[in-house]
Amino acid sequence: MPVYNAPTRDTRFIVNEVLRLDSYGNLPGFENATPDMTDAIIAEAGRFVSEVIAPINLSGDREGCTRHPDGTVTTPAGFKEAYRQYVEGGWGTLSAPAAYGGQDLPHVMGLIMELYLASAKDRKSTRLNSSHVLIS
């Protein structure tokens, strides 16, 4: 089974050295984007995608979703639990406004999570993060 390791080192370099995200701390939405905060988010997002999301891709490919005659749908093994952890971790709300339950972080922090989900070949990444489009 393929193993996915999120490129956290490269991501930290881009955020801290290239974008210098901390230099925008005086702008709305950037107040909490300190190097410590962004490093912690990058590390945990990488861990979550590498350890929780990537391993269930195989069951998704093999099992797929099943629609039952009563209209209910069963997802592949591990998907329900992974989604629960995704929601509880607040991963879909990183860059959403606090007024709508978001974390008010710069949009780039949400994009990092999207990048990790997509690069782990997670077929549901576009559905998981579509809520930011509704709020924007």
What are these regions (language model features)?
Residues 1-125:
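Amphipathic, small/basic residue-rich leader segments at the start of a protein or domain
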Residues 128-136:
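Single conserved hydrophobic/aromatic residue that forms the stacking wall/gate
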